[in-house]
């Protein structure tokens, strides 16, 4: 299994941002979800955390919900997401205050357990997107083409937690090599995902 992708350069990240904005209008929904989530957490919105996360899931992960072997986005699915957020609320609140640079070996059991629970409900791509929007400085993003670009092949729901932990370690190394948030600000994980998305998902780089 290959886990190496060349560490991106500043020029590549900047070019990816330009291409991403040209080719991906759905970024609007990411920004809306982030804003809605922050206002919900601050008690400034009538929407719930689940509804804020749903903005991302129903736009960036919509293919998950049209497959025959995955759940519909119905009342039961919303209740399942509510349950995830309730059960893992304390852990998510703690991770929301951290950056991926702070990732430690002793985070592994909690991160893997958290991801496994989300994976079983949302699939491996939806799990990463939901966790990222809930703690955007800490949880790394991926999709299947991006993972496959690194030689990583995602499995069925509930089988990907260790792969995601390894992805977190790999992304932390990338962030540190790039200079971290001190160089790029708090949106560095999103910038890396934009480069991966342009390179492996829509292949415009």
Where are the predicted features?
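Short hydrophobic alpha-helical segments that form membrane-spanning helices or hydrophobic packing faces
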Residues: 127-133
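An N-terminal alpha-helical hairpin/helix-loop-helix interaction module that forms a charged
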Residues: 1-118, 136-205
């Amino acid at each position: 299994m290959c886990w190496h992708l060349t560490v991106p350069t500043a020029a590549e990240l900047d070019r990816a941002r330009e291409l991403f904005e040209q080719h991906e209008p759905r970024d609007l929904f990411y920004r809306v979800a982030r804003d809605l989530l922050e206002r919900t957490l601050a008690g400034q919105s009538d929407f719930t955390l689940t509804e804020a996360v749903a903005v991302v899931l129903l736009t960036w992960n919509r293919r998950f919900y049209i497959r025959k072997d995955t759940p519909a986005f119905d009342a039961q699915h919303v209740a399942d997401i509510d349950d995830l957020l309730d059960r893992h609320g304390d852990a998510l609140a703690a991770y929301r205050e951290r950056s991926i640079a702070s990732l430690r070996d002793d985070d592994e059991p909690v991160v893997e357990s958290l991801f496994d629970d989300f994976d079983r409900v949302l699939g491996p791509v939806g799990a990463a997107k939901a966790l990222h929007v809930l703690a955007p400085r800490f949880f790394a993003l991926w999709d299947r083409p991006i993972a496959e670009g690194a030689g990583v092949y995602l499995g069925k729901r509930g089988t990907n937690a260790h792969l995601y932990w390894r992805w977190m370690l790999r992304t932390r190394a990338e962030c540190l090599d790039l200079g971290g948030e001190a160089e790029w600000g708090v949106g560095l994980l999103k910038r890396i995902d934009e480069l991966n998305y342009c390179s492996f998902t829509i292949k415009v780089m």
